[in-house]
């Protein structure tokens, strides 16, 4: 099955939050009471039941102020730190290249929360589970667009085969010129959500400049964990071999002492 990519062209985003509402509706997520912090951004951040958020950012430009809108959510990394650290296998790759959570086996350890370079997974104390966007996996399996892409009225969110979406992104950057750039296809193995940004990535809030899998995750998952499993396997294998060759260990006979007796 061909890998899929969601392309977000922020130059076309008007901040209408249609995608945010569509995500809530499709995933049957209730709204939460929030406080006004002097911004149109609401809620203030991603939550365990808010998987898509339009970030509102005011940027000074010469003698005026302009808005930057950015849809935030899971980037669905090819080399996903969350999948690497998940001890239960709850976080896994799908046939579309995206990352989903099997909540029936999630143990609420929050390792993925700490490991994610994009600060995406959110923990719910009530259910003791972690939640994030799954790119509408149930819709993809039914050959439907993700709810956010379906709802976007300006064409800022599009969805399709990976190669076609990346090609479209670079064509759009060439059309925009200036500081426009493609964000997402060059790190963590390539993400399955990519942006066309109007400004340098450093300008955008809550968007890491050069995200990567934490070194501690690499050391544990790719080096220490296999070695520990190998060592543990060696102990088990040695014990089994001893059992086969010598049988079970018998208790000492009465009167048989140990040491120098």
Locate predicted features.
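Non-ligating segments of multi-cofactor redox enzymes
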Residues: 1-261
């Amino acid at each position: 099955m061909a890998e899929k990519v969601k392309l977000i062209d922020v130059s076309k985003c008007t901040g209408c939050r249609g995608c945010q509402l569509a995500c809530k509706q499709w995933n049957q997520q209730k709204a939460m009471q929030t406080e006004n912090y002097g911004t149109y951004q609401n809620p203030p951040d991603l939550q365990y039941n808010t998987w898509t958020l339009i970030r509102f950012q005011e940027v000074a430009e010469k003698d005026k102020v302009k808005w930057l809108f950015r849809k935030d959510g899971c980037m669905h990394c090819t080399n996903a730190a969350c999948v690497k650290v998940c001890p239960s296998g709850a976080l896994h790759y799908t046939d579309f290249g995206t990352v989903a959570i099997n909540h029936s086996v999630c143990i609420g350890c929050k390792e993925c929360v700490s490991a994610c370079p994009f600060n995406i997974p959110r923990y719910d104390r009530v259910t003791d589970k972690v939640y994030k966007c799954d790119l509408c996996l149930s819709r993809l399996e039914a050959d439907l667009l993700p709810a956010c892409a379906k709802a976007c009225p300006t064409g800022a969110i599009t969805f399709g085969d990976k190669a076609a979406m990346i090609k479209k992104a670079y064509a759009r950057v060439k059309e925009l010129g200036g500081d426009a750039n493609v964000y997402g296809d060059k790190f963590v193995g390539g993400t399955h959500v990519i942006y066309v940004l109007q400004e340098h990535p450093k300008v955008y809030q809550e968007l890491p400049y050069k995200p990567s899998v934490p070194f501690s995750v690499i050391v544990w998952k790719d080096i220490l964990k296999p070695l520990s499993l190998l060592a543990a396997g060696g102990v088990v294998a040695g014990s089994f071999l001893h059992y086969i060759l010598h049988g079970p260990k018998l208790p000492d006979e009465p009167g048989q002492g140990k040491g120098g007796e």
